[in-house]
């Protein structure tokens, strides 16, 4: 059988695109292992983060503001999307597990990162006339941090909820099949290209599936499936794995869960410390973010220790008697310039929908509609994502002049969250040394193109990252 569309991947984006296409009475086969080992979606806290995700860096460029607009549109789509999934799947279990989001500004971070990002969140809420209220952090129920890192300010965003990512993926599977789609529980080896046209995929088993068009939404693994078109892949921002750890814990009997998301602003290259109630006494704790040379399948002891320490310190000192149910590992897809890869990619009939970093699950309803419209010739009137076409030179977030400084600040923020204790006169020495090292690295990569701060920091460690960046930059020089 030849399908209208093959969608490669089993995360929230792939599942949503496949479901949307099937619901339009098109023949669709979604290909990807449904155990979703190490997928970002499965390990996600699944916050409907929009304003809570804002950083000063996001607002520093028009491309960053476009990502914010994607988040805002997506947030408005979720109630109807959740109802559609319930209707199609027949699964009426409540998808949302948290009501609203508390953003806390505590003393575990540093002024140049935490305070600046907290102010950016509040300023943008005001600019968008979005609902929120300032609250006394002492009045946030459930929150019982160590006094040394207690929050000094807090705000509540009433319409930024969170959902159960595991249940979402189950509903997407069931909804696809109910709408007539085919679910192939096997991973893809490569996309098949013939005479400059995508014609299908080859599975790891050797089986071949054919389609008029192929959408690759396989997260951090997406570009690995295009190895037979190296001249095209070389012009696409390479995707790096943002390895992250999250933990599910079971609270002791009689102990209540928070009713909202509780989170800090984004800091130290990560998405901020956060907890999300999952119901039935289960609490989600997240999340770390370490750029790795390749996707990881197991959590490091150091990252588990760090996350648990932060949760005990900054959220609830009584968490020590909770049971650990699961240590989850996910790999976020992080493009070389930090911006999504959405659109046809140099081969007729071949589309990419990945590179969304930590926003993919939240943006999945929007991306499903956007990609389905584009694939079927329907004009997208809500938003234009042409600038995120995968075949592109690097997009600019932070200016090159401040990149080394921003990288140093994020690295120092990591130290503060570890509760380091160093002599004050060491700070200027560390600052000067790291700034010089990072600036030298930036200059050595390319005279014009500059990676975002997290890639500056981790490519300084890994030669393989530097090689991939240089190869991509050379393609556009």
Language-model segment annotations:
Residues 3-30:
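N-terminal Rossmann-like FAD-binding beta1-loop-alpha1 element of flavoenzymes
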Residues 6-8, 209-222, 368:
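Short hydrophobic core segments
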Residues 16-20, 24, 33-34, 42, ...:
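Active-site substrate-recognition segment that forms the wall
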Residues 47-139:
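Dinucleotide-binding Rossmann-like beta1-alpha1 core, especially the glycine-rich loop
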Residues 92-110, 121, 134-179, 288-292, ...:
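Helix-loop-beta segment of a Rossmann-like dinucleotide-binding subdomain
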Residues 155-204, 209, 213:
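Helical element adjacent to the flavin cofactor pocket in flavoenzyme catalytic cores
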Residues 316-418:
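C-terminal catalytic lobe of FAD-dependent flavoproteins
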Residues 374-477:
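Helix-rich C-terminal "cap"/substrate-channel and partner-interaction subdomain
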């Amino acid at each position: 059988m030849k399908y209208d569309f093959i969608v490669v991947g089993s995360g929230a984006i792939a599942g949503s695109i496949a479901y949307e296409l099937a619901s339009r009475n098109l023949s669709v086969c979604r290909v990807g292992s449904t155990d979703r080992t190490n997928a970002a979606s499965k390990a996600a806290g699944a916050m409907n983060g929009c304003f809570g995700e804002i950083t000063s860096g996001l607002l520093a460029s028009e491309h960053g503001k476009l990502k914010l607009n994607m988040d805002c549109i997506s947030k408005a789509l979720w109630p109807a999307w959740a109802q559609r999934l319930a209707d199609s799947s027949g699964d009426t279990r409540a998808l949302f597990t948290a009501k609203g989001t508390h953003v806390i500004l505590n003393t575990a971070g540093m002024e140049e990162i935490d305070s600046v990002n907290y102010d950016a969140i509040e300023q943008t809420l005001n600019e968008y006339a979005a609902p929120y209220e300032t609250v006394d952090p002492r009045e946030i129920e459930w929150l019982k941090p160590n006094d040394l890192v207690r929050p000094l300010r807090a705000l509540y965003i009433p319409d930024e909820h969170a959902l159960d990512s595991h249940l979402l993926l189950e509903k997407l599977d069931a909804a696809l099949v109910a709408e007539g789609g085919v679910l192939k529980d096997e991973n893809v080896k490569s996309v098949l290209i013939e005479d400059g046209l995508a014609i299908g995929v080859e599975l790891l088993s050797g089986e071949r599936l054919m389609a008029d068009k192929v959408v690759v939404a396989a997260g951090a693994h997406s570009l690995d499936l295009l190895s037979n078109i190296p001249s095209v892949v070389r012009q696409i921002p390479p995707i790096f794995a943002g390895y992250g750890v999250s933990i599910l814990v079971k609270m002791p009997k009689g102990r209540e869960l928070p009713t909202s998301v509780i989170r800090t602003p984004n800091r130290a290259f990560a998405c901020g410390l956060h907890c999300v109630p999952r119901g039935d006494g289960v609490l989600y704790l997240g999340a770390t973010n370490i750029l790795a040379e390749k996707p990881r399948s197991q959590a490091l002891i150091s990252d588990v220790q760090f996350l648990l320490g932060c949760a005990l310190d900054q959220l609830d000192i009584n968490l020590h008697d909770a049971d650990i149910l699961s240590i989850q590992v996910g790999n976020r897809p992080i493009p070389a310039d930090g911006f999504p890869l959405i659109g046809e990619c140099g081969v007729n009939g071949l589309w990419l929908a990945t590179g969304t970093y930590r926003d993919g699950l939240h943006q999945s309803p929007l991306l499903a509609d956007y990609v389905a419209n584009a694939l079927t010739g329907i004009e997208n009137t809500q938003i234009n994502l042409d600038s995120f076409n995968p075949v592109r030179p690097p997009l600019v977030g932070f200016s090159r002049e401040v990149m080394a400084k921003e990288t140093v600040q994020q690295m120092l923020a990591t130290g503060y969250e570890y509760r380091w204790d160093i002599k004050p006169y060491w700070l200027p020495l560390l600052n000067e040394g790291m700034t010089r090292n990072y600036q030298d690295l930036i200059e050595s990569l390319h005279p014009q193109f500059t990676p975002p701060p997290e890639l500056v920091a981790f490519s300084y460690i890994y030669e393989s990252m530097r090689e991939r960046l240089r190869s991509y930059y050379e393609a556009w020089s």
